[in-house]
């Protein structure tokens, strides 16, 4: 496999991963059972304002990118210019990613409010939640495995873990808990009830990581073959 073919295939798989990830995250919100922790703040704000969810996700991603840049400038490790260039490239990726989410948001109805009959029922909504978690896990695995540009949500966790010298998994838990706490505060402060946090939030916290592990275990050979540089 030539270097050019290798790069093209990695970009195609990365793009496929982004598309699947956007579907999973959007589908999660449409079940009305609770969104993933890191997106709970933009989701709650979108419900309290007239700003669309994808637009607020983009703003949240820009904030994550800014945090990464500040951390990398502070740490001054490795080729800082190269690292900062990669950080900034996340803005373009985030813009494309959130536009894909916007398309899905237009096409997919809110199941318990905009659908009828079986599509409103709890079993169907849980089925869609499971599908959302599977899509989120597969999409995240594909984008991470291609080693191109990190999703800002993953990138900020990695940067914070590096700053505080803790395992990425532990830092991810702290970030998730912080997002949930902020969402609960904003919800109660401005509406008097919980927005965006539910059983789906807890299932997503546990389930997405498991899906990533299973996917990488099943497709390790085929995925790694795309990442190898020719000898």
Task: Put a short name on every predicted segment.
Residues 2-231:
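Core subunits and conserved enzymes of cellular information-processing
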């Amino acid at each position: 496999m030539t270097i050019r073919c290798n790069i093209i295939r990695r970009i195609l798989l990365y793009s496929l991963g982004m598309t699947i990830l956007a579907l999973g995250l959007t589908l999660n919100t449409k079940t009305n059972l609770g969104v993933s922790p890191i997106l709970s703040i933009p989701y709650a704000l979108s419900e309290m304002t007239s700003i669309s969810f994808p637009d607020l996700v983009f703003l949240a991603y820009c904030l994550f990118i800014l945090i990464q840049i500040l951390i990398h400038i502070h740490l001054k490790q490795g080729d800082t210019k190269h690292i900062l260039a990669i950080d900034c490239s996340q803005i373009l990726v985030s813009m494309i990613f959130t536009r894909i989410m916007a398309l899905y948001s237009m096409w997919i109805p809110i199941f318990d409010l905009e659908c009828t009959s079986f599509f409103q029922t709890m079993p169907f909504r849980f089925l869609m939640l499971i599908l959302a978690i599977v899509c989120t896990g597969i999409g995240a695995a594909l984008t991470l495995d291609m080693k191109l540009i990190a999703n800002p949500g993953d990138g900020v966790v990695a940067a914070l873990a590096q700053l505080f010298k803790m395992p990425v998994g532990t830092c991810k838990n702290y970030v998730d808990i912080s997002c949930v706490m902020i969402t609960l505060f904003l919800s109660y402060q401005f509406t008097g009830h919980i927005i965006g946090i539910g059983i789906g939030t807890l299932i997503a916290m546990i389930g997405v990581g498991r899906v990533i592990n299973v996917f990488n275990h099943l497709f390790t050979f085929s995925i790694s073959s795309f990442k190898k540089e020719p000898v």
